[in-house]
Structures are given as structure tokens and as C-alpha cells.
Amino acid sequence: MSISRTVFGIAATAALSAALVACSPPHQQDSPVQRTNEILTTSQNPTSASSTSTSSATTTSSAPVEEDVEIVVSPAALVDGEQVTFEISGLDPEGGYYAAICDSVANPGNPVPSCTGEMADFTSQAWLSNSQPGATVEIAEDGTATVELEATATGTGLDCTTQACVAKVFGDHTEGFRDVAEVPVTFAAA
């Protein structure tokens, strides 16, 4: 059993590395940001998605899912290289997820979204799971998780300073990379 878990863990790490996109290291900038929160709830009925926001950002609904997942992102106006926090609730503690800043437009023919950051660099992308070796964030029994990432504005073929991007939670390789929840984010001017 131990060998199969190790092999599965290695395969899972390889799948994660292949799934997440690479980019140039972010440029560090020190500037204060006013913190705000945004919430998007996604449920089985995609027309019931709602958003509460202290900014004027609009929201899009994700594909229908079984969970009622909420993401609270702070700050809402991201600065490349600074910390961003995802407070996530409604997750299945037995499930597996990724959290990252991603393109708001899906990749045609590919379930894996284009996200910012470097491949397998868990400073800009997180893997949430209680059962997978190598996961970077555990999910509490009540379905909550806190993810702290470095806000990264660019990825392969993605520039969130000029393209619409979202803070996204999506299923890991065991969940088919399905969309779970997302909330629009913007990067503050440098």
C-alpha cells in the first residue's frame, strides 16, 4: 500500500507540473494596496451564482458543481509580487482542488485553465487535498481552506494586466480539472 501511495504521489505531482503553466518570475514591487473582498458562490444551478463586492468588478458563473463553494479574495486590486489571500469555504474535504489566478476564458479542448506563475511553483498556485501526497494546503473538516499566494500577473500566453483574469478554484487531476468557483480580479497599475 505504501509503495502504491508513493507511486500515486509521484504521478500526481507529475500531473500537477504538466497541468500548470510556466512564466517569467514576477517583478517585485512595494506599494500599499487598499484591501477589499469579493465573493462568488457557485452551486448546481449556474444562474444562481451571485457576487458581493466592494469593487465594481463583474462576475461570471462556473460550470454547475455539487459544492456551494465561496471564495473571498483580498486584496481585490492585486499588485504583482505581493501576497493575495483566498479564503475558501464549501469544499469537499475528501476532494482535491487547485487555487490560482487564471485566465477568465477557458482553453478550448483542454480542461486545464491557463494560470499565472511558474510550473509547480507553489508560491503562485496551491494544491488543496487531504489525501494526496505533495498537496500544499489541507482542507478543514468543515470544508474551509486558507490559501496565501504571491500575486503573479503573467503566465505562458497570459497577461492579467491586459486580459481578464479570475481567482479560481478548480478540481485537481482526481476531479478532472472541473471548474468549481471563480471571482474576477484585477492587477493595480504599477
UniProtKB/Swiss-Prot annotation:
Compartments where located: Cell membrane
Disulfide bonds: none
Annotated segments matching region Disordered: 43-68
Listed GO CC annotations: plasma membrane
Entry keyword set: Cell membrane, Lipoprotein, Membrane, Palmitate, Signal, Thiamine biosynthesis
Membrane topology category: Lipid-anchor
Covalent lipidation (N-palmitoyl cysteine), chain numbering: C23
Function according to Swiss-Prot or TrEMBL: Is necessary for biosynthesis of the 4-methyl-5-(beta-hydroxyethyl)thiazol component from which thiamine is formed.
UniProt name for this protein: Thiamine biosynthesis protein X
Organism the protein comes from: Corynebacterium glutamicum (strain ATCC 13032 / DSM 20300 / JCM 1318 / BCRC 11384 / CCUG 27702 / LMG 3730 / NBRC 12168 / NCIMB 10025 / NRRL B-2784 / 534)
